[in-house]
Regions:
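Positively charged, small/polar-rich N-terminal and surface patches that mediate targeting and assembly
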Residues: 1-100
Length: 100
């Protein structure tokens, strides 16, 4: 069994950004993604009302060069304007050809 080193990019953002973020990560080279609801508390505190919408957690496994493109786009277009965080982890995957 061969394991392939890749990057797991995780983006936590306002749910209203879901469609736009999916389009961006795919355009930048991601072959797929997973989205789940997210909640918690950070530097902006907890949201006090539901009408503001929920957060989502978008995860995608990509080669390093794609991860860097995604992070650069987030920094340029999203971080200044929206409640968005992102982080990258090293992962080793089976069937790595599905991700490159």
């Amino acid at each position: 069994m061969d394991l392939v080193p890749l990057k797991l990019v995780t983006i936590v953002a306002e749910s209203l950004l879901e469609k736009k973020l999916v389009e961006e990560v795919k355009r930048l080279g991601a072959k797929g993604y997973t989205i789940v609801p997210a909640r918690g508390e950070g530097s902006r505190g907890m949201r006090s009302v539901d009408w503001e919408g929920q957060n989502i957690r978008l995860e995608t496994i990509v080669p390093e060069e794609v991860a860097l493109k995604i992070l650069a786009r987030l920094q340029e277009a999203y971080f200044p304007h929206y409640a968005v965080i992102a982080y990258v982890e090293n992962v080793w995957v089976v069937r790595g050809e599905k991700y490159v």
